[in-house]
Amino acid sequence: TAAAVHWLAWRYTRDHLAAMTAALAFTFCFFRMHHGHGHLNLIWCFWIPLSFVAMDRWAERPTWTRLAVWTTVLVLQALAAWYQAVLIVVADALFLVWLFAVERRTPRFSRLILQGLVGALAAFAVVWPFARYYFILHSEPPSYASGASADLVGWFVPPENTWLGQWLLAHGVKGPRWIWGEVTVYLGWIVVGLASAGVVVSMRARDALTRRARFFILLGVVAAMLALGPFPSEVASGSFGWSPFGLLAHVPGLSLFRIPARYSELLNLALAMLAGIACAALHRRFGLRGRAVTMALTLLLLADFYVVKFPGGEPQPFPVPPVYKYIATLPAGAVLSLPDYARTDLWFQEADYQYFSTAHWHPAVNGDAREFPPQFVEVADRMKRFPDPDAAATMRTTGVKYVVLHAGQRGAEDLLAPAEASPDFRLLVRFDRDYLFEVVPAASTPAHTSAAP
């Protein structure tokens, strides 16, 4: 991410120190510190700044090679996560309009349309096989989006997990939020100050290179308006209307963007770029003294975002249980782990099974998700009746070959004895309180008969 933003900023400043400041301001912004411990897909956003570079080069000289580069960048970002797909579509759409409406790029219109259509079709062909599964999800109402929208407190009050936030709390100031809130999207005082100077510089500049940075003012304003979510009138009516977020909520696919505050990612990128513009102007005017000030401010902005007193404490080793490593030595077959935590109060523990599956890479039934297809829920509920015969029959028809029973966990301790006695399951191995059962093929299972009346 830092390298991508550095390259983008250098193209606007031709100043590596200023570009470095922009890169660090975005890479270590609090939004990324906030999501970096739980939503890794939300920090895999380095393709967005690269898309600006690729699109700029294509608009300058629309060759098929440059189109292929831009399309590839767009597709790779979209595949990272649906949120990132929406963010790059919004960012690139804005930049495309800027290039042709404001900067007056004038390539041959017919060539532009042809290449644009080909690129769009190619991107759709690659992304759709993955994206189509998102359309089982339902859109959230304005009331939900309103509760996950950014606000001035979230943007400008240092969180309690920063040095400044701790200082404010120590002096009795109420307002700092904790790091685990979706609306804790602190922008950073140093970055906002530098970006404000960058706005002035780009608006007053006479050289074409610096004037081009005005695009990031537009990007920041649009991102902020989207991050603020729906209007109060939309919340009251229960339907999206004419707010920027509400307008996008009417677009299929884009309507699945549930949490407006996450548009702050684009706002952070815009602020970082404008901060780089301010630093470059400082260097041009004051030379070495300006560079010294930039280095000092860069250290301060990093300190501004530095996370202290993280609620989860220091990361602790979390080894994969040996039973999953043993599965890697067995023939291919899908794996079910129990107890199943999906759709329970302990839903977050379901993701552990996804992590454990990296030890064997067999197909796994378990997994955390925002929403489950109804057919999957029905089948999974039958399998969770383990070790009932109906559960075994469902496993056979769906290709589930192995069942890991964590008998030491609440909700699983009473399943061990019936499982060991069941003719449908064969105990393969035991590691402490973790038991691995194999689903016995139907041909090898004695017929189940009902007791005579």
Q: What are the language-model segments listed below?
A:
Residues 206, 283, 296-453:
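Extracytoplasmic
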Residues 187-214, 218-227, 278-280:
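Hydrophobic, aromatic-rich transmembrane alpha-helices
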Residues 10-14, 56-69, 97-111, 200-209, ...:
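Membrane-interface junctions at the ends of membrane-embedded or membrane-associated helices
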Residues 72-73, 96, 106-131, 142-151, ...:
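Hydrophobic alpha-helical membrane-interfacial segments at the cytosolic entry of transmembrane helices
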